[in-house]
Amino acid sequence: MNEIIITIIVLILLLFITLSRNDRNNNQSNNGKKEKLIKCKKEVQQLRQKLDQLTFQ
């Protein structure tokens, strides 16, 4: 009986460890996506400025 209880507790702990790892990995990939998005927005802004300069010449 004690072995079953210990086994259940260990399985629950493993589940929580796995879930916390998944959350951490998701956060890291989201941060990478945000950085890429910010970089793309800056590039678009620069290209718009160049286009404005060319159209006003």
UniProtKB/Swiss-Prot annotation:
UniProt keyword annotations, A-Z: Coiled coil, Signal
Signal sequence segment: 1-22
Domain of life where this protein originates: Viruses
Coiled-coil regions listed in the entry: 26-57
Keyword Coiled coil recorded: yes
Protein name per the record: Uncharacterized protein 137R
Species annotation: Invertebrate iridescent virus 6 (IIV-6)
